[in-house]
Each structure stands twice: as C-alpha cells, then as structure tokens.
Amino acid sequence: MSPAIKCLILLAVIALFFVTEIIPLAITAIGGAVACGLLGLIPAKQVFSGLSNSTVVLFAGMFVVGAAMFYTGLAQAIGEKVVHIFGTGENSLMLGLMLVGTALSSVLSNTGTCACLMPVALGICAASKNPASRQLLPMAYACGWGGIITLVGTPPNIIGSGALTAAGLPGFSFFEFAWIGIPLSVAGILYMLLIGKYLLPKAELDADQEIEQEIEATTHDKKKQMISGMILLVCVIVMALDFKFISLEMTAIIGALVCVLTGCLTEKQAYSSIDWVTIFLFAGMMPVSTAMDKTGAGKLIANWAVGLMGGEPTPLIVTIVLFSISCFLTQFMSNTASAALLCPIGIAIAKQLNADPKAVVMAIAV
C-alpha cells in the first residue's frame, strides 16, 4: 500500500472520530500525529513539531490576555455601560447587546464574551420587563460573527493562518478577516433588527435563574480593569501594525506575561484560561497536514475534488463548494476541528488550480 493511500485512510479515520467524538478531539489529533510517525509517513522527529509551531504560542498568549478582561470584570463593565447607553427598549437593547458582543468577541473568546454578557442581559431585561429570550439569541449570534473580524477572534481563523504558514505561504494579517467580518456583522445586525426579531421566541425566562459563566470575575478593581484593557489595546495595535521586530506570537506572550505580573490574573488562572483542546488539536493536525503534502495524499484529494467539479472549476466554484462543506461539517463537529481538517485540503486544491489559497482558507475558516 502506498504512503498516500495510508495517509488517506488515516485522514478518513480522523474525520470519523472528529464527527462522532467517540474519543476527545485533542486525543484524536495527537493520535493522528503519532500514527503518521508509526506508519512512516513523516520522520519521527516531526511527530510533535506542531507543539513548537508559533501559532500555538499565539493561541496561548491571546487566551490569557483575553481572560484578564473577564477576571478583572472589565468585559462585564463594558457590557453594562453600553447597554445603559442604548436604553431598555427592545430594539435599542438588542442593538446595544449585539454591538458590544460583536466588538468584544472580535478580540476575546466568543464563548467567554457571551457568558459574561448573559447576566447583564438578564438583569436589564428583568428590570425593563423585556422578554430575555428575545435578547439572548441575537447577542449569541453577535458573539459568533464578531469573532470573524480579526485573526485572534476565533480559533479557526488562527488555524487557517497556521495552515498557510505550514504550507510555506504567507499567513493572514491581523485585520485581513475584517473584509468579510465587518460586512457580515453589519448584515447580521440589520437582519436581526429588521427581520430576525419577528422570528424570536416570546417565552419568559426566570431572571433569577443561575447562569453558569465560563470565567467569573475575581475582582472589580478599577486599576486592574484599566491595566487589562490597556494590555489588550496595545496588543491589538502592535499586531495590526505588524512590526518587523516583533511577531504576533511575541506580542501575545508579552501581553500574557504582563497580565500575570500586574496581578490582572494569577498564574493558575492563566493556565486554566488556555483552551488546551484547541492547542493540542492544532498541534496534532499540523504533522497530519505535513504528511498529506509529503505523501501526495493532498494532491490525490485535490485531483479527485477537481474531477468532481468538472475538471476545470473556477476558483469561485471551489471556494463556494468548500465553504458549503465547511458549513455542513460544523453542524456535526467542532468548528475548530472542521477548520483543522479542511484547511490543508483547501490549500492543496487551490495549488492544483493555481488559485489564491488565502481566499479558499478564509472561506473555510468563516
């Protein structure tokens, strides 16, 4: 059996485990990397090369910087302030929650932002006699599409950039996703205000029910809130300016170190704020991606996919097809796992057609 066929079989097994989650995603990814080494698809010394990838460092650093905003209570304070500015009318409250959700989730954890804003939304809704069920769903949507705006907004964006870098191509800049993220966010907000609100449930929620937050604020010290906000702002500015003497991952780690040194969060909180599943999933899939490239499995998939699309599909058709596949897969599996699985395949297809891999990868990540 040729190495390419072995790699394809392994990829199919990984995809099956990703969809069914019979075993944890991180275990599947790391197991896939180990299998690549055992099958001789890549040299043994490359099996854990993903753990030293600079993208892993970027992930870890930004998880900590973002968590500092939650632990100091700054994220919740911003949410409360914005909601009070917009008022308690149904439409104005919905707009305020969506705007703050979009803005915060563009640089912070989507889930963390949503969990942080939920008590704010419930409290305001209870005081203003607004049905909370009509505010929570638009807010959750906003936290989802807000993550598309920047490179660090959501793990699939960073995974896509890492896949490009691993393939020897330039990765995405910090605000490159904004070309899609901002118009999509504006369209989403307008849709919810003009059409979506009529489709929302009208059931009342118990305002006193306990909401389990991803990260509880451990302090409301104004000084620490200001420090955590300044750290995030400086990180975003430095990443956006893309200085040659300091990389994205260096910026993220420096920001994380300053967060701990200034007491915005403890060392233990910093460790717990890192999404280790995302870290190991990405680190495990990088060697699998390398194996696909070296064995020719990626090219086989690309040739097969191109053949299914008529032999000479336009880059637009390829992008639409991969976007649709990604949307379909994320209904059954983690969006992070979906991106890790599809990005290397998308790059292989783009190379086969001499198309821009960035456009294809961006469509998959979005």
Ranges and model annotations:
Residues 1-60, 64-66, 176-303, 319:
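Hydrophobic transmembrane alpha-helices of multi-pass small-molecule transporters
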Residues 3-4, 22, 51-52, 69, ...:
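Alpha-helix capping and helix-loop boundary segments enriched in small/acidic/polar residues
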Residues 6, 65, 127-142, 146-214, ...:
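Juxtamembrane and boundary regions of transmembrane helices in multi-pass small-molecule transporters
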Residues 13, 27, 31-34, 38-128, ...:
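Membrane-embedded alpha-helical segments and adjacent helix-loop junctions characteristic
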Residues 14-23, 100-109, 141-152, 237-244, ...:
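Transmembrane alpha-helix interface/packing and boundary motifs in multi-pass membrane proteins
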Residues 27-32, 110-117, 137, 149-153, ...:
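Hydrophobic alpha-helical membrane segments of integral membrane proteins
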Residues 40, 70, 83, 87, ...:
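Non-catalytic alpha-helical coupling and interface elements of nucleotide-dependent molecular machines
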Residues 114, 138, 175-176, 188, ...:
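Active-site-proximal structural scaffolding
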